[in-house]
């Protein structure tokens, strides 16, 4: 598989984020002068004004950069919160509002192999007041793996963080962004570990490996080398399963940096270049048109507020004849209890029923639309998994606390109650992008 050079991969993101806006001031901070010059060459078609700096100390001299790039410049400060804060303040102040900030950092030698989650969180929630009194920060576009490192060096922990400087409304909320909300509520590190114990190794969705394989096979025949986008890839079990079982190349995305840090650590151990991951929002990332044979999502899109926009983006990303398969939490047709409404609000879910999903799919232009209420199977799985915990409580308690145990038992029991009242459904959706007439 071919890969872009690191500077050209950076240029690719700049073109995506700027969406054609003019760029006249590109600043590069690279301790390695030779590597810094490769950015000059790559960005020359965009602008002749590309300046290279070899020290973070020079950052304070930069202002109004349209593009600010850091190439392996943070290795001495990434574990020091005070120095990181100073860096982010200087980087934000050096960038024009609407400008692009790209941070390339190779984390393979970090003792903490999940350092990417810590940095993503730190960068994503940082805010500072500029000279005009604006509350500014870095709006996350994506955290991607460096393609050259993946394919040439088998290093899966070399990253490019891509942000756009933005003015944010002041907030006193405990969670600053939706990614921050996910990682501090449902997908804490302990929460993820407990989910994985319940669902099975590498999975945090109902039924684990076997159920996922059964669902995946409903796509039909796969051919080695075909491509799949996995939205809400979690800790990566489904992506690696499709690559292992069918030879499909998978681009897995998730907004939870905690979950993807686990997926990335395991991918680095396994060295499977058929799989790559991005920490990003499916409603933000600019996928290439007509680029995937399949789009897959397991129990994720209930987190996404705009289903119409999501389906439109999936449609554009699929090749003609490509298929999309989604399982999702949905709402039933029974009168919703107050307890269920509270649960939905706490999880920040945006639930649809089967008819609403089918209507959106048809309106988007999909054909061969199939929907199915899989709630009876969901009930079976919930009973099996709750029973697994009750029968193996000693093992669970050797790894987790009483609080985690009680939370899982009550969560599974509550879902069974929601199912009985036809509040909570588990829905299946399969459709195809038509071939041109």
Swiss-Prot record:
It catalyses: N-methylethanolamine phosphate + S-adenosyl-L-methionine = N,N-dimethylethanolamine phosphate + S-adenosyl-L-homocysteine + H(+); N,N-dimethylethanolamine phosphate + S-adenosyl-L-methionine = phosphocholine + S-adenosyl-L-homocysteine + H(+). CDD domains: AdoMet_MTases. The lineage of its organism: Eukaryota, Metazoa, Ecdysozoa, Nematoda, Chromadorea. N-methylethanolamine phosphate binds at residues 186-187, 195, 329, 343, 347-349, 415. Feedback inhibition by phosphatidylcholine and also by S-adenosylhomocysteine. This is Phosphoethanolamine N-methyltransferase 2. Its EC number is 2.1.1.103. The keyword Zinc-finger does not apply. Catalyzes the last two methylation reactions in the synthesis of phosphocholine, by converting phospho-monomethylethanolamine (N-methylethanolamine phosphate) into phospho-dimethylethanolamine (N,N-dimethylethanolamine phosphate) and the latter into phosphocholine. Phosphocholine is a precursor for phosphatidylcholine, a major component in membranes and a precursor itself in the production of glycoconjugates secreted by parasitic nematodes to avoid host immune responses. The gene is pmt-2. GO terms for molecular function: N-methyltransferase activity; phosphatidyl-N-methylethanolamine N-methyltransferase activity; phosphoethanolamine N-methyltransferase activity. Belongs to the class I-like SAM-binding methyltransferase superfamily. InterPro entries: Methyltransf_11, PMT2_N, SAM-dependent_MTases_sf. It holds the Pfam family PMT2_N. Pathway: Phospholipid metabolism; phosphatidylcholine biosynthesis; phosphocholine from phosphoethanolamine. GO terms for biological process: methylation; phosphatidylcholine biosynthetic process. It comes from Caenorhabditis elegans. S-adenosyl-L-homocysteine binds at residues 204-205, 232, 254, 281-282, 298. The keyword Lipid metabolism applies. Disruption phenotype: Essential in multiple developmental steps, its disruption causes developmentally impaired worms. Keywords: Lipid biosynthesis, Lipid metabolism, Methyltransferase, Phospholipid biosynthesis, Phospholipid metabolism, S-adenosyl-L-methionine, Transferase.
